[in-house]
Structure formats: structure tokens, C-alpha cells
Curated annotation (Swiss-Prot):
Stored Gene3D superfamilies: 3.20.70.20
Protein name, per record: UPF0210 protein lhv_0606
Subunit structure: Homodimer.
Pfam families found in the cross-reference section: DUF711
Top-level division of the source organism's lineage: Bacteria
InterPro entries the UniProt entry points to: UPF0210
Stated family: Belongs to the UPF0210 family.
Amino acid sequence: METKQILETIQMISEEKLDIRTITMGISLFDCIDSDGVKARQKIYDKLTTSAKDLVKVADRIESEYGIPIVNKRISVTPISMIAAACHDDNYVAYAQTMEKAAETLGVDLIGGFSALVQKGYQSGDRKLIASMPEALSETQRVCGSVNVGSTRAGINMDAVKQMGQVVKDLSEIDPVSCMSLVIFSNAVEDNPFMAGAFHGVGEADKVINVGISGPGVVKRALEQVKGESIDTVSETIKKTAFKVTRMGQFVGNVAAKALNVPFGIVDLSLAPTPSQGDSVAEILEEIGLESVGAPGTTAALALLNDAVKKGGVMACEHVGGLSGAFIPVSEDSGMIKAVEHGNLNLEKLEAMTAVCSVGLDMVAVPGDTPAETISGMIADEAAIGVINNKTTAVRVIPAKGKQVGEQIDFGGIFGYAPVMPVNTNSPAKFVQRGGRIPAPIHSFKN
């Protein structure tokens, strides 16, 4: 990088809220499998606390040495449904508690991998883990869970879609805020550093470092310099900015991996917003030319942003992965919150936006009396977008117990707050209750 670019990067950190959103260490737990659940959990605790013992210390040192803010230090593990399947426990709440205890000991912010992959069907461990989710996630503060219900190669497991609607509903009855720790995927990726969907894939190395970047404020500031210019210029400006942001992510990842003696995995090219003013994906879209997010043209502007971020990021880093695109979580983005409060953005428009960006209906609050079948319908719609378009999509929806449209639910910190949004009241119950599996699309047959 030239001196001018280095100075620009320093300015991004000091003035434009550029940071590393997360350094996530992925850890395989296959060598912790045991038919005795107590022994398995002790092995898990020992491996986590040994493998990641220096993670927080190294991240803090990088932060102070290079002046680059690192917001979260996280861990992802092999899906627990696979690790716990060998034991004879009736439920896996104790595994979540072991993960929580390890995270507390290490001082990490979150730990992901209380997960199951059921896109084509269940094995015994999947059933036990999913049934344990409401209790496990409500009793822990740092544990995150995910379930993959569909893929382009397998289609959509509608039995799992039906069950996950009920799981979300059951969890919200215990503690609505805990729903932010649960995400339901199609085409889940194995190297995702972001929560709540991170897990350590079966094809990954024993340990790996993955980095998630941020930087919506940086992109917005860059676009302020090209007001009124053509869309080509907008795209080029975003690409150049994404290059610098990603370069910093790779640098931090390499330094951390070397210090921890762990392979460097990927940089996730996702623009991750926070509730802070000036750190919003919605504000980027408005800078491109929309009066408000949700206006006609929103999906096109988001597609432009997403594509330009990827093109710039790929040039800056030899290994990219994860979700890689723009995140549009309602509660974590001040511009999204404002658009919902003013009635400019609804669930249907959000769903359309998810067809061209990372993830899906994310951190969306709905009325507490929303039926489980309606939540299942939302999950099925998002899964269909992912399966047909060969991309990752997800649902992280929060039924706000005791609240109605227009009220708010507060998650605190970087998770912000969400206005409760109206949901179409027509029932998909008969569709959801059919069960079975939606077949894989015709274009999935690539061989």
C-alpha cells in the first residue's frame, strides 16, 4: 500500500468507525467424542481452554500495538449434534453449559456451534440437540446455536422447518432476548466467523483463525465524495474502499494466526453495522440515492453494494469466505431501525433484499402472539431463496413476548433494539404441517 492509503486507513479507524468486528477461532471437537457424556464434556472443556488460552490476550495486544479496534473475540466449534451423538444423554443442555463455562474461563464474547445440520434428515444427535435448544440457549449467555434446514443440493427439510418455528416460539416464551442466539440457515457455511451462525465445519483444520470485518461508515464517507456521479463511479468507489478494509482484516488475521500458531483461514467480506450513528448499511443505500431504505430501488442499490464489496475484497485477500456481503440486521443498524419506525421498511421488502445480500431476515422482532407456523413459513421462504439462488440465507427472528406492533425490544450493546414489525396474519399452517422434503432444484445437478 502507498503512504497515502496507509494514512487513509488510519483516518478510517479514528474518524469513520472502521474496526475488526471479530476474530473467531474455530476448534474441532472430534477428538473429544466419548460414549460417556461426562467424560466428553470434560474433554471439550479442556480442549477449548487449552487451544484458545491466548486468544483474548493476542487480540488485545494487536489492538494496542497497531491501533486497530477488535470488537469481539469468539470461538466456533464442531456442531455439537455430531460430537454428543455417541453419548446416551437424553438432552444436550449440559454440553451448552460446558461451552458457556469454557467461554467464561477464556473471556471470549461468544461461542458458536450448538448446532445441527439437518438439510436432508435427522440423526439421533440432531433430534436431541434441537429439542434441547430452548432450555440450553435461555440458560446460557454466550452460547449460540444454529440449524441448517436446507441446501441447494439437498432441498428443504420441511419437518425441520416446522420444528424450528416451534423451537423459536418456545425459546421466546422463556426469554425473547435469547432468540438472538439462534439462527436457522439454508446453505450454511463452514467457516463463518459471525454469530449466531458460526460453527467449525467438518472439512476444516483442527484449529483455524477467521476474521470478520466491519466498516459501513467508511463506505458511506467515501460515497459522500462522489455525490451525483454515475453508478459506475459508485461501484468503483465501493470496490476501492472494500479493498482497504479487507487488507486490514487479512493483516490482523495473519498476525493473530502467527502469534497463536494456528493456520489463518479466511476473511469474511461482510459489512457488519452497529446501532451507532454513522455505522449503518442503510445509510450507505441512502447515500447511493434512496430517500429511505425500503423505497423502490432498494434491492438494486443493495445488489450493487454487495457485488462491489466482494470484488474489492477478493483483490485484497487470497482467502475469502464466510458469508461475505452486506448484513441487514434490523436491530443492529440505526438506519434500518429508523426506516421501520417511519413505516418505510416492512418484512416483505426485507425478504426481497435478502435475495441479493448476506444472510436474511436478521434480528427482526415480530409480535409475541405470532404463531409458530407463521415463523416456520418465514423460515421456509428464506430457505427457498437460498436454495434456488445457491446462496446462504437465514432467519433470526424474535417473537417479542407480550409486545405488539410499534413497541420495542432491547438487546443491549452492539445488538441494539428492534421495533416490533407487523406480520401477514394469513396462516401457512396447512402447508407447514404437510412435512416432508422440498426437492432440490433442477439446476443443482452439476456433475
